[in-house]
Amino acid sequence: MGSFSIWHWVIVLVVVVLIFGTKKLRNVGQDLGGAVKGFKEGMKSEGEDAAQTPPAAQKEGGRVIDAEPADKK
């Protein structure tokens, strides 16, 4: 009870193939693979963009003002 044997998964796979057909499943697999590939490329380019951009504190021409807040009256 609670755990599925290999035969349960085989039956589920057969039912899914009968309902959707192999062509539809292949198209879904291609779409899913393309989405994963696009996501990985996006993450890779995001990492490269972050490495090329200097942090805000290290940008040239900026200045830091050290002050304390004034009391409101």
Swiss-Prot record:
Instruction: Tell me which domain of life the UniProt entry assigns to the organism this sequence originates from.
Output: Bacteria
Name the InterPro entries on file: TatA/B/E, TatA/E
Topology term for the membrane: Single-pass membrane protein
List GO terms (cellular component aspect): TAT protein transport complex
Annotated spans, Disordered: 43-73
Has keyword Protein transport? yes
Example GO molecular function = protein transmembrane transporter activity
Which keywords does UniProt give here?
Cell inner membrane, Cell membrane, Membrane, Protein transport, Translocation, Transmembrane, Transmembrane helix, Transport
What binding partners and quaternary form does the record give?
Answer: The Tat system comprises two distinct complexes: a TatABC complex, containing multiple copies of TatA, TatB and TatC subunits, and a separate TatA complex, containing only TatA subunits. Substrates initially bind to the TatABC complex, which probably triggers association of the separate TatA complex to form the active translocon.
Function, as annotated, reads: Part of the twin-arginine translocation (Tat) system that transports large folded proteins containing a characteristic twin-arginine motif in their signal peptide across membranes. TatA could form the protein-conducting channel of the Tat system.
Q: What is this protein called?
A: Sec-independent protein translocase protein TatA
Taxon lineage:
Bacteria, Pseudomonadati, Pseudomonadota, Betaproteobacteria, Neisseriales
| Gene from which this protein is expressed | tatA
